[in-house]
Amino acid sequence: MATTKSFLILFFMILATTSSTCAKLEEMVTVLSIDGGGIKGIIPAIILEFLEGQLQEVDNNKDARLADYFDVIGGTSTGGLLTAMITTPNENNRPFAAAKDIVPFYFEHGPHIFNYSGSIFGPRYDGKYLLQVLQEKLGETRVHQALTEVAISSFDIKTNKPVIFTKSNLAKSPELDAKMYDICYSIAAAPIYFPPHHFVTHTSNGATYEFNLVDGGVATVGDPALLSLSVATRLAQEDPAFSSIKSLDYKQMLLLSLGTGTNSEFDKTYTAEEAAKWGPLRWMLAIQQLTNAASSYMTDYYISTVFQARHSQNNYLRVQENALTGTTTEMDDASEANMELLVQVGETLLKKPVSKDSPETYEEALKRFAKLLSNRKKLRANKASY
């Protein structure tokens, strides 16, 4: 329902927009969105590694990083963790993790994060190791220090409202300048898997704010692309760097959306005869699976429709594997064998066609995106030098 409402708002805003010429390349807003999915985050990590490698090759710069090219990077659950890894600064004010470091991170820490430590009456994992690793990696870094705009969603179970962490929100809501490790644990706290996370923030005027957060997938249902576009739209309206963008027009947006894979349009299918025998617990598990899959599919459909309506379909690329099988469909199977399979899935996905109607592979499409991102960055730099 929330996703449908968001789409309708965006759709009617676009219909109300008068036809305009395509934005200058240097003034296009570039957006990267990364889905949630637990250990399946290995799949988009492979895609990010390929893209960053292409950017380094095109610009002949081995130190090029994704945060140098995207105006907004958003994610939820494991996608939010990837967002933090590639936007959180190190002591040299550069991303503390290159894209090639993400898969090794999963291999090193995944088995400890997803090591059963709960009980039949509580979450499957106690989350202690996850929180410890996040504290070690992200330190005391806060939202305002992110190297580009971020859009990370969580959900507060005490206020029953989504909580969106972005740099641009901080002027009006300084309490949202939380530590990145608190945010990353919160967005990983998927119901059933990890316990909710409680923390407080303090503003400069001495006010204290309390948060009781769970996985952002509760708010964005796994696919944060609409949220990321919303943040990008606000950025375009407020930042003088995008002066030619007078209203919402997807000709002026460049969106890369990365999924964590499904085994069809829906993660699992059931018959009415099967479902008729389910009790409340079984229904709870099935509803979570079906809602996530259906919402991800519909979000992609909505966004594709809007970009096509503005004759800007080449400005949107959704990278998603729809043929996962066996253990690769599980968000918490961090066995080495399964993680190796997920790496293979990501590498194979690069060779697959973007759609049934197009011979272009994901690898070719990402190379095209890399050239656009590189050219835009150079034009932006040249404009700033005058």
From Swiss-Prot:
EC number: 3.1.1.-
Domain PNPLA, chain residue ranges per copy: 32-229
Signal peptide coordinates: 1-23
Keywords from the named record: Glycoprotein, Hydrolase, Lipid degradation, Lipid metabolism, Plant defense, Signal, Storage protein, Vacuole
BP terms from Gene Ontology: defense response; lipid catabolic process
Any one GO CC term of the record: vacuole
Record Pfam families: Patatin (PF01734)
Predominant subcellular localization, coarse grouping: other
Intrachain disulfide bonds: none
Localisation: Vacuole
Protein name, per record: Patatin-B1
InterPro entries xref list: Acyl_Trfase/lysoPLipase, PNPLA_dom
Functional note: Probable lipolytic acyl hydrolase (LAH), an activity which is thought to be involved in the response of tubers to pathogens.
Alphabetical list of Gene3D superfamilies matching this protein: Cytosolic phospholipase A2 catalytic domain (3.40.1090.10)
Motif annotated as GXGXXG, chain positions: 36-41
GO molecular function, one term: monoacylglycerol lipase activity
Span of the annotated motif DGA/G: 215-217
Additional free-text comment from the UniProt record: Patatin have a dual role as a somatic storage protein and as an enzyme involved in host resistance. This tuber protein represents approximately 40% of the total protein in mature tubers.
Motif (GXSXG): 75-79
Carbohydrate-modified residues: 115
Active site (catalytic residues): 77 (nucleophile), 215 (proton acceptor)
Gene designation: PATB1
Domain notes: The nitrogen atoms of the two glycine residues in the GGXR motif define the oxyanion hole, and stabilize the oxyanion that forms during the nucleophilic attack by the catalytic serine during substrate cleavage.
Lineage, uppermost ranks: Eukaryota, Viridiplantae, Streptophyta, Embryophyta, Tracheophyta
